[in-house]
């Protein structure tokens, strides 16, 4: 088609057309850039190379296709007020629109099921969670989306006469298809995701309560409260003797040589117990100055900081004695290691690195899994908020077309809010996930740092 041959009143003023075109052009560019960044981050970052993150690559690809094949033609149709392009392309364009939208929400549904299986059948499912298996699931997702989106291309239904005037490209108005596609593309996957995430929450809550119960049980089974003695070392801790190699270092730095500690254990919570107090600021990070004592660190301080502490749990310095806290910290010899827990407990030993390293690694993995599950819950929530108004009003028009039809302007607004969702996932990853933040920073800053600009 070459355009209209009759007088046509533009739907928007020149100023409104320029503003809308600028905003949607920015949306297109931002969507392509952000989702391309997500794909690069997953494919190049070691911390994001888990097989399940292939779901995010496929989801980002669907959003890029929306930005390149759907939104530009929707913008032209909106600003011109008629369909400028070929009639055959209108049918393909509508089918692709449904395909990409359905693919996005079925991806989210598959991701939520993947998280549920990983939580409920951790050992069994994680051994089967291979890249090949994830790719097969992704292929199934696209096939489901194709089955839902292709019927209008195959079955034309009752051919209505072409309206006189300018050509239009409108959504399918067959009531059966509206209801079937809305249920298959949105409402059924939404219901599945809500039920699955409720189940994940119940499992996580139960696991948390079980962990607290085990912690209380182990606390009751321990020896009685340590009694301070003259030397300041509790006498009730029945652990193997660990001799601190720091006394000679303390003497060399001008500190009086402290009495040899015969027994080491958990830091007592009794404020009167003076051996290794919880407020011991013995583990500063280089380049960051002194931080809070280990007793001030709790699980409520946030997962980001927790993981950084976990990954950097190899200490650099340790004072020679409790009295030397106010003095500059001493360099710890390489022969001993320190294990600092979130409750402020400090354990010294020469061979704790291997066993504790596995524990810290497991803790880091669980922390990352928990954060990632939260991020995906936010992604799903934002998707539902963006697309629910459109699918609700679209279905309402099929159920009672005479009395429940939504005004055209409001329906178009809901339509464009749904498109905006394609640009939001990279923002969500950046705000809520530090692994993506690090990967984005590395991708964006590396060319500048290498060229010296």
Swiss-Prot record:
Tell me which parts of the chain lie in the Extracellular compartment.
1-17, 81-90, 159-174, 400-408
Keyword Transit peptide attached: no
The task this protein performs is described as:
Alpha-2 adrenergic receptors mediate the catecholamine-induced inhibition of adenylate cyclase through the action of G proteins.
One GO biological process this protein is involved in is: angiogenesis
What residue spans carry the Acidic residues bias annotation? 300-314
Subunit-structure text = Interacts with RAB26. Interacts with PPP1R9B. Interacts with GGA1, GGA2 and GGA3.
Subcellular localization(s) per the UniProt record = Cell membrane
User: Pfam families in the record, alphabetically?
Assistant: 7tm_1 (PF00001)
Q: Where is the composition biased (Polar residues)?
A: 287-297
CDD domains linked to this entry:
7tmA_alpha2B_AR
* Organism of provenance: Rattus norvegicus
Residues with covalent lipid (S-palmitoyl cysteine) sit at 445
Similarity-based family: Belongs to the G-protein coupled receptor 1 family. Adrenergic receptor subfamily. ADRA2B sub-subfamily.
- Its transmembrane ranges are 18-42, 55-80, 91-113, 136-158, 175-198, 376-399, 409-432
Keyword Transmembrane helix included in the entry's annotation? yes
Disulfide bonds, paired cysteine numbers: 90-169
GO CC term (a single one): intracellular membrane-bounded organelle
Q: Which UniProt keywords apply?
A: Cell membrane, Disulfide bond, G-protein coupled receptor, Lipoprotein, Membrane, Palmitate, Receptor, Transducer, Transmembrane, Transmembrane helix
Annotated site location: Implicated in catechol agonist binding: 181, 185
What protein name applies here?
Alpha-2B adrenergic receptor
Single annotated GO MF: adrenergic receptor activity
Q: Could you tell me which residues belong to the region Disordered?
A: 213-331
Membrane association type: Multi-pass membrane protein
Tell me which residues are marked as the site Implicated in ligand binding.
Answer: 97
Instruction: Name the gene.
Output: Adra2b
InterPro entries referenced in this protein's UniProt entry, alphabetically: ADR_fam, ADRA2B_rcpt, GPCR_Rhodpsn, GPCR_Rhodpsn_7TM
């Amino acid at each position: 088609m070459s355009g209209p041959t009759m007088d046509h009143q533009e739907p928007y003023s020149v100023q409104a057309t320029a503003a809308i075109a600028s905003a949607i052009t920015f949306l297109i560019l931002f969507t392509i850039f952000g989702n391309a960044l997500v794909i690069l981050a997953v494919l190049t970052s070691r911390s994001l190379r888990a097989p399940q993150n292939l779901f995010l690559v496929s989801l980002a690809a669907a959003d890029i296709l929306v930005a390149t094949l759907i939104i530009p033609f929707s913008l032209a149709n909106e600003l011109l007020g008629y369909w400028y392009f070929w009639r055959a392309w209108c049918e393909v364009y509508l089918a692709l629109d449904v395909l990409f939208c359905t693919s996005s929400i079925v991806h989210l549904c598959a991701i939520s099921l993947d998280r549920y299986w990983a939580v409920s059948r951790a050992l069994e499912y994680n051994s089967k969670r291979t890249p090949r298996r994830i790719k097969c699931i992704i292929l199934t997702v696209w096939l489901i989306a194709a089955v839902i989106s292709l019927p209008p291309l195959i079955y034309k239904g009752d051919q209505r006469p072409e309206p006189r005037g300018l050509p239009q490209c409108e959504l399918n108005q067959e009531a059966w298809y509206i209801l079937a596609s809305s249920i298959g593309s949105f409402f059924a996957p939404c219901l599945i995701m809500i039920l699955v995430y409720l189940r994940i929450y119940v499992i996580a809550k139960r696991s948390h309560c079980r962990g607290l119960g085990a912690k209380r049980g182990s606390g009751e089974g321990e020896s009685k409260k340590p009694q301070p003695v003259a030397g300041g070392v509790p006498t009730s801790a029945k652990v193997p003797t660990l001799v601190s190699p720091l006394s000679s270092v303390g003497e060399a730095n001008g500190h009086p040589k402290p009495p040899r500690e015969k027994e080491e254990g958990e830091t007592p919570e009794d404020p009167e117990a003076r051996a290794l107090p919880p407020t011991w600021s013995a583990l500063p990070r280089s380049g960051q100055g002194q931080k809070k004592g280990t007793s001030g660190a709790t699980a409520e301080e946030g997962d980001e900081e927790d993981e950084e502490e976990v990954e950097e749990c190899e200490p650099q310095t340790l004072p020679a004695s409790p009295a030397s806290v106010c003095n500059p910290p001493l360099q710890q010899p390489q022969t001993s290691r320190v294990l600092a827990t979130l409750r402020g407990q400090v354990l010294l030993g020469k061979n704790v690195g291997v066993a504790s390293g596995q524990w810290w690694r497991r803790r880091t993995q669980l922390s990352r899994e928990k954060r990632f599950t939260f991020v995906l819950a936010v992604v799903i929530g934002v998707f539902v908020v963006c697309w629910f108004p459109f699918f609700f009003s679209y279905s309402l028009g099929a159920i009672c077309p005479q009395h429940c039809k939504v005004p055209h302007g409001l329906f178009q607004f809901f339509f464009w809010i749904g498109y905006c969702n394609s640009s939001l996932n990279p923002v969500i990853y950046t705000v809520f996930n530090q692994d993506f933040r690090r990967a984005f920073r590395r991708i964006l800053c590396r060319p500048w740092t290498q060229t010296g600009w």
